[in-house]
């Protein structure tokens, strides 16, 4: 498995049988490198969304139309995407598992909101915010937490799914910060590898993973902090 960080919470996950984008926020993402777009959309099979905020839905509509990739998201967000012309949708909701060829995706809780704001400034709810647990046939289990704070039922995510790779938001203000994210990883999970995200993009969130890395000192988990465009092999 190759996991490429694309800035903010966007990732490209490549296995022998699937090419997946998670939360593909490219346009307007200060951290995204424009030259990456063609490489990470070539042969794309799936787009997975954790929630409906613009910095996570990102370029989903355009990419789905360009590539024909299947989009998985919560039910309300899928209904909205359908109205935008996205044809191949896999709607679900918290607790549900959907089989997608060589892997399955399970919607788990996240403590966050999920909405789009229209031109009149009104915020319209787009279902629950979620984390996503991906179980692959021949690869490590991956848990993208989405945007969230720490919560005690993370213990159940570990018990039920035993994720080996954690993608963890650490930027503070809109998600948990680095110290709390490290506490979540150490108290509730047995990750072999943790990859921090949701930092270093907008100036009002944390710019580096230093606090998270310091909080993980002494843990058995490998903390991987790739540069934007860098790859973690798992």
UniProtKB/Swiss-Prot annotation:
Q: Which organism does this sequence originate in? A: Sinorhizobium medicae (strain WSM419)
Q: What Pfam families does UniProt report for this protein, alphabetically?
A: Lactamase_B_2
Q: Does the keyword Hydrolase apply?
A: yes
PANTHER family, A to Z: UPF0173 METAL-DEPENDENT HYDROLASE MJ1163, UPF0173 METAL-DEPENDENT HYDROLASE MJ1163-RELATED
Tell me yes or no: is rRNA-binding among this UniProt entry's keywords: no
InterPro entries given in the database record: Metallo-B-lactamas, RibonucZ/Hydroxyglut_hydro, UPF0173, UPF0173_UPF0282_UlaG_hydrolase
Q: Which UniProt keywords apply?
A: Hydrolase
Which family does this protein fall into? Belongs to the UPF0173 family.
The entry's protein name is UPF0173 metal-dependent hydrolase Smed_0942
Write out the GO MF terms: hydrolase activity
Q: Which HAMAP family match?
A: UPF0173
